[in-house]
């Protein structure tokens, strides 16, 4: 039994060291754009991520089946969205927003989902929208309990950096039910303005 405990402790320690190394590398290579060996975290308009009609592999068990009919979702089905709840409310607001032409419930797998690099691999925001003015909006909804989580903060930093490198063609929104004294609809208005 002593060997099992030692092996478990070593496994936990190695995992912690791996996470620390990932965070350090991410900070150096991704979140420090001025350094000589930093990665470029900006949209590649020469090879953009394209949502192709008919290419949205939403597993049958994860498809939205609620009563609300989304009018602007790019695909006829939605994946990973439960009827009711905070993300559902966010999706409804995106769907009804006058600045949104089309939107997608982003898949959390490549190559069909849009992702950005993080210390733990890739981050797939909740929603991607094409706006009526031609800009691309990448939107991430967070529950209040996650707003101060270090990994979630890293995602926000990466998304913000990505949008800043877009020459105004893309925006990144970090949304919550209440944030900085604004409700969800108000936050969405500010982000999409």
Predicted features along the sequence, with ranges:
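Intrinsically disordered, low-complexity, repeat-rich regions
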Residues: 1-121, 129-135, 142-193
């Amino acid at each position: 039994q002593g060997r099992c405990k030692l092996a478990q402790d070593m496994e936990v320690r190695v995992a912690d060291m791996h996470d620390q190394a990932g965070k350090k590398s991410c900070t150096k290579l991704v979140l420090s754009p001025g350094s000589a060996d930093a990665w470029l975290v900006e949209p590649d308009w020469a090879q953009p991520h394209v949502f192709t009609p008919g290419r949205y592999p939403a597993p049958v068990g994860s498809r939205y089946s609620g009563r609300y009919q989304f009018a602007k979702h790019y695909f006829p089905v939605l994946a990973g969205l439960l009827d009711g709840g905070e993300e559902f409310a966010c999706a409804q607001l995106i769907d009804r927003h006058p600045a949104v032409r089309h939107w997608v419930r982003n898949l959390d797998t490549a190559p069909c989902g849009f992702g950005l690099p993080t210390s733990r691999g890739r981050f797939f925001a909740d929603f991607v929208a094409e706006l009526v003015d031609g800009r691309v909006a990448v939107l991430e909804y967070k529950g209040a309990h996650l707003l101060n989580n270090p990994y979630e903060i890293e995602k926000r930093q990466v998304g913000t950096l990505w949008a800043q490198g877009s020459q105004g063609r893309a925006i990144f929104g970090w949304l919550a039910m209440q944030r900085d004294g604004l409700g969800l609809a108000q936050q969405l208005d500010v982000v999409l303005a």
